[in-house]
Amino acid sequence: MGIAPRHMKTRTSTQNLRKRVRYHFRGNAAGSTLRLTLGCLLGLELRRVGSGGRMTFCAAGEARLSQWMAENAQVCWFEDPEPWTAESELIAQLDLPLNLDQNSHNGFHPQLKELRAQARQRARDLPVSH
């Protein structure tokens, strides 16, 4: 579950739903927690890239993840004038095992958090991928 725009008290968000969904489907794990989670669950190897500060599944892994998402992921949405409020309420009421933020009550939360932490640690232990 995600929202667009995000709640910003001092400025207007530059993100909209189309941009956020497009990035989840075409971006990489460094900028998408959804891609990071799905890639870890699929057993893709997370690696440090560039100067070593970002982590992705590299070109082949990101392509494989994009293909998996094209075949398996679905998107739905609803409009709300304050989506940040609706997000909190829905996460509290629904079983959304892939959401970590605001979702520590979910039974899968500790396992998913640990899986992602292990993937990040393995990536830190490997050389930077070029």
Question: Where are the language model's segments positioned?
Answer:
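Boundary/linker segments flanking structured domains
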Residues: A4-H130
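Short beta-strand-alpha-helix junction that forms the catalytic/metal-binding core
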Residues: M1
